[in-house]
Amino acid sequence: MKNVSILGSTGSIGTQTLDVIRRNADINVVALAAGTRVSDLAEQVREFKPQLVCIGKEELVPELKTLIGDMDVKIVSGDEGLIEAATIESAEIVVTAVVGMMGITPTVEAIKAHKDIALANKETLVCAGHIIMSLAKECNVNIYPVDSEHSAIFQCLNGERRGEIEKILLTASGGPFRGKKRADLENVQLEDALKHPNWAMGRKITIDSSTMVNKGLEVMEAQWLFGVPAEKVQVIVQPQSIIHSMVEFKDGAVMAQLGSPDMRLPIQYALYYPERRKLNTERLDFYELAKITFEKPDMETFKGLKLAYEAAARGGNIPTALNAANEVAVARFLDRKIKYLDIPDIIEYAMNEVDYINNPTVEQILSTQKIVTDMIESRW
């Protein structure tokens, strides 16, 4: 029996993780943490019976208590509660599926508590990769990627030497606006940007996919996970989302991982690695598929990807500035307060305006986030 704590249990990755667990009797959920979806969290507590449950805001605790007051479960809240869920003694592995930079501190604390990490929170490595990876090595903790692309790379590298990687080929669907030019995106509406062609995801990551900022974050994530510089991570548009990523080695051989676009596969792989379990998901029919196509990404139209490579090259707290600016800009767009093309412009502004810090601490990373957030909110 494996004991699991899930941070972000009511979100897209969290609910799919619970779906995987529901189909496997040998995983026990010991902690659940969510933001504001009280009723969803209460239903999960009733089904999975964890020892501890965390709700994001303290003022929501009374509502949660009315729904699960008869249950034998400890209720905590806020940032401290999230850390308690991440470090609960009985957990062997922590699924970090919270959205945004709030995932950094609980991930750090979970590693210090010697918990393996199933990582679905990009911002943790984008902003604090230099801290996370060295700490994981020091604490002898495994980090298993949950992103479909990074899981694919991880699978391609099984039995291979990291030093023999020539480059990583990170695939992208191209999103709903593939093939469009910047002028075509002037009047994009929220509903258009939320229509991803292949994947069912949360609202924020769906917008990030449409701007290709998500792929830029994945480039930075890959450099830390696999120990390669960002310039050796090449983005390739693969519209069918069948090849989830590839690795090219020194001898010219290329390894690829293929599969139907179903997030339960990388989630299950992270939970059970190195074992593979039966998963009732759609199988690839290569006769039906007939062909797989590739395209070069348009970095002028999708400036967010270009800015991510720039942030990776500059390093320090610049990836944090990019990420923080993107979080604010996407939230503004979701609230219909800015235009779609304002998103990359806001990111570029923040990257140029923030004071550079080399090798930032967690405190400096969070300070950069606040500075950038305040800077953008005062202007937009």
Curated annotation (Swiss-Prot):
Which first-to-last residue range defines the signal peptide?
none
Keyword Oxidoreductase part of the UniProt annotation? yes
Which species is the source of this protein?
Lachnospira eligens (strain ATCC 27750 / DSM 3376 / VPI C15-48 / C15-B4)
Annotated pathway: Isoprenoid biosynthesis; isopentenyl diphosphate biosynthesis via DXP pathway; isopentenyl diphosphate from 1-deoxy-D-xylulose 5-phosphate: step 1/6
Family according to the record: Belongs to the DXR family.
Residues annotated for 1-deoxy-D-xylulose 5-phosphate binding in this entry: K122, S148, E149, S173, H196, S209, N214, K215, E218
Q: Which reaction does it catalyse?
A: 2-C-methyl-D-erythritol 4-phosphate + NADP(+) = 1-deoxy-D-xylulose 5-phosphate + NADPH + H(+)
* Classification via InterPro entries: DXP_reductoisomerase (IPR003821), DXP_reductoisomerase_C (IPR013644), DXP_reductoisomerase_N (IPR013512), DXPR_C (IPR026877), DXPR_C_sf (IPR036169), NAD(P)-bd_dom_sf (IPR036291)
Q: What NCBIfam families does the annotation carry?
A: Dxr, PRK12464.1
**GO BP terms:** isopentenyl diphosphate biosynthetic process, methylerythritol 4-phosphate pathway involved in terpenoid biosynthetic process
Instruction: Give, as one word, the top-level EC class.
Output: oxidoreductase
EC no. given is 1.1.1.267
- Provide the residue positions that the database annotates as binding Mn(2+): D147, E149, E218
Q: Enumerate the residues binding NADPH.
A: T10, G11, S12, I13, G35, N121, E123, G202
For this UniProt entry, the molecular function terms from Gene Ontology, in alphabetical order, are:
1-deoxy-D-xylulose-5-phosphate reductoisomerase activity; manganese ion binding; NADPH binding
Q: What is this protein called?
A: 1-deoxy-D-xylulose 5-phosphate reductoisomerase
Q: Which UniProt keywords apply?
A: Isoprene biosynthesis, Manganese, Metal-binding, NADP, Oxidoreductase
What role is this protein assigned?
Catalyzes the NADPH-dependent rearrangement and reduction of 1-deoxy-D-xylulose-5-phosphate (DXP) to 2-C-methyl-D-erythritol 4-phosphate (MEP).
Q: Which cofactor does it need?
A: Mg(2+); Mn(2+)
